[in-house]
């Protein structure tokens, strides 16, 4: 796939598209402008679509990704030294706001591998989680722990693969990420026609998901119980949770949520307590822990004004008997309660303090 340079003729408008004497406004039609702004190609299946509708459309309304790339030659000329495979071209991405993308010029067979993905190697402890890391891929060890990250955010480390955008849904995905050895490759998961944008995301199979080992026998069990576990309600949630963890198969609707969840399996703990240096995999867990040092109790009961450092403590308190309306059936068969003791307020305060202390020891639910 690799080895050729972006052809020079792709950087200028074809003479057939611009008649002598026409102004630039007459060449860049409303259709071209609409495609540039909203990333919608009129001809997503190549020249065949234009041939079928040649009696309805003019050459200005049926164009390919290559023609559009030529129309915005000023943008592409900055990348004239970028090494591109002969089978692809760089043009405006079909995803709004994502800049340039990579499109196929010819048919690309299913199973075609592209790569390796290049960039600087970053250790897990040196990753800045506050930055946008969308040009970064994980490389895993055989035991599923993160070995390092490959970061292509710096221009001197970028290759043509950097401009391949992430798919937003299963329907538009045509590439998947695979790990071969300690290198990252993109693999075509279907036959890709000309003038289609290459869009990548994680593969559904745990065998191709960055080389993470799967759970032995899990795939066979899933096939066996496929019809038993199917529920119509679950199918509606499928598209929203298409990004699945290959360890526990939980679905997520964003790449950042999936990465955050993966720290549970990889034991990566980037969040450090400034008081005791204890490490946590989730920022929310760290916030709850820090409150034990600071004494902060932001969760307050509106009935008795008792305060708690964690939401779980408040919810446990609200479920206690004094927050429930008395049951008539229970009152009819229950013995009479003794009269309130003089020290009842002190005992109630002690009970509330004990409940708060117990809440501190409740195991945190990590999702």
Curated annotation (Swiss-Prot):
This is PR domain zinc finger protein 12. The keyword Transmembrane does not apply. Interacts with EHMT2. Its main location: nucleus. PROSITE patterns: SET, ZINC_FINGER_C2H2_1, ZINC_FINGER_C2H2_2. It comes from Homo sapiens (Human). Transcriptional regulator necessary for the development of nociceptive neurons, playing a key role in determining the nociceptive lineage from neural crest cell progenitors. Initiates neurogenesis and activates downstream pro-neuronal transcription factors, such as NEUROD1, BRN3A, and ISL1, specifically within nociceptive neurons, while repressing non-nociceptor cell fates. Essential for the proper function of nociceptors in adults, influencing both their excitability and their gene expression, thereby impacting how these neurons respond to various pain stimuli. GO terms for cellular component: nucleoplasm; nucleus.
């Amino acid at each position: 796939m690799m080895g050729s340079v972006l052809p020079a003729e792709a950087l200028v408008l074809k003479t057939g598209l611009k008649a002598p004497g026409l102004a630039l406004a007459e060449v860049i039609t409303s259709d071209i402008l609409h495609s540039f702004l909203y990333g919608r190609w009129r001809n997503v299946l190549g020249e065949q679509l234009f041939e079928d509708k040649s009696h309805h459309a003019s050459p200005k309304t049926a164009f390919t990704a290559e023609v559009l790339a030529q129309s915005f030659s000023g943008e592409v000329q900055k990348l004239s030294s970028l090494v591109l495979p002969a089978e692809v071209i760089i043009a405006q991405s079909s995803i709004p706001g994502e800049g340039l993308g990579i499109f196929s010029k010819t048919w690309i067979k299913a199973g075609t591998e592209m790569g390796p993905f290049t960039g600087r190697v970053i250790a897990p402890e040196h990753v800045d989680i506050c930055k946008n890391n969308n040009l970064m891929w994980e490389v895993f060890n055989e035991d599923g722990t993160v070995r390092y990250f490959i970061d292509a955010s710096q221009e001197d480390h970028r290759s043509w693969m950097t401009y391949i955008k992430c798919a937003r849904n299963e329907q538009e995905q045509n590439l998947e990420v695979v790990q071969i050895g300690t290198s990252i490759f993109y693999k075509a998961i279907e036959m890709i026609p000309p003038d289609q944008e290459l869009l990548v995301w994680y593969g559904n199979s745990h065998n191709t998901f960055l080389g993470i080992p799967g759970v032995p026998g899990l795939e066979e069990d899933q096939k066996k119980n496929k019809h038993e576990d199917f529920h119509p309600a679950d199918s509606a949630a499928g598209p929203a949770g298409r990004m699945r963890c290959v360890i526990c198969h939980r679905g997520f609707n964003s790449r950042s949520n999936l990465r955050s969840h993966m720290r549970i399996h990889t034991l990566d703990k980037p969040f450090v307590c400034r008081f005791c240096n204890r490490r946590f995999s989730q920022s929310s867990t760290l916030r709850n822990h820090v409150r034990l040092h600071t004494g902060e109790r932001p969760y307050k009961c509106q009935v008795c004004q008792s305060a708690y450092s964690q939401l779980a403590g408040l919810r446990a308190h609200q479920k206690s008997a004094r927050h429930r309306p008395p049951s008539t059936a229970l009152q009819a068969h229950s013995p009479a309660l003794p009269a309130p003791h003089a020290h009842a307020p002190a005992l109630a305060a002690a009970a509330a303090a004990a409940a708060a202390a117990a809440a501190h020891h409740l195991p945190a639910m990590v999702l």
